[in-house]
């Protein structure tokens, strides 16, 4: 990597705790480096994103406050319930109304963990990628593997 103009930033100890958030670490980092027009963060735990995904995200940024990589949720949240002991507590009205056919339930997406992009000044002002005119780039599931557990590592190894 010596031929690349890359500066490694080691996260301070207070940003390497269970309570610390990536967003807070990024905002603090922005205060320590030279200012740019935009700030983009690529999470190392989502290594299968490709250059075309990043280009698609960058192309949306001129018309947005921020751009976030997204992936389709395999299970719809509208079928979610809370369990209290053995009591089932439906969260959404559709379960009580018998509307459970997933073919007719709206699809939901979640951040894939691959990247977050935003305008520098906007991020410093709002400290949030989800405020304003937020755009999403849908990344296919095979490139949206967010590796956080040993099971995720095993799944990622199967993809290699």
Give residue ranges: language-model regions.
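Short, well-ordered alpha-helices that flank and scaffold nucleotide-derived cofactor binding pockets
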Residues: 31, 59, 158
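Short loop/helix-cap segments at secondary-structure boundaries that form the rim of catalytic
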Residues: 1-3, 127-128
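Catalytic donor-sugar/metal-binding loop of nucleotide-sugar-dependent glycosyltransferases
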Residues: 65, 125-145, 150-160
């Amino acid at each position: 990597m010596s031929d690349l103009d890359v500066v490694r930033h080691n996260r301070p100890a207070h940003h390497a705790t269970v309570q610390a958030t990536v967003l807070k670490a990024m905002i603090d980092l922005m205060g320590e480096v030279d200012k740019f027009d935009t700030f983009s963060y690529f999470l190392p735990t989502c290594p299968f994103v490709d250059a075309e995904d990043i280009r698609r995200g960058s192309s949306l940024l001129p018309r947005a406050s921020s751009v976030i990589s997204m992936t389709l949720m395999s299970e719809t949240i509208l079928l979610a319930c809370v369990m209290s002991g053995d009591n089932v507590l439906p969260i959404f009205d559709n379960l009580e109304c018998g509307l459970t056919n997933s073919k007719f339930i709206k699809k939901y997406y979640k951040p894939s963990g691959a990247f977050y992009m935003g305008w520098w000044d906007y991020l410093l002002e709002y400290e949030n990628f989800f405020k304003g005119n937020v755009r999403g780039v849908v990344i296919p599931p095979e490139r949206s593997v967010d590796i956080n557990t040993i099971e995720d590592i095993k799944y990622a190894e199967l993809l290699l």
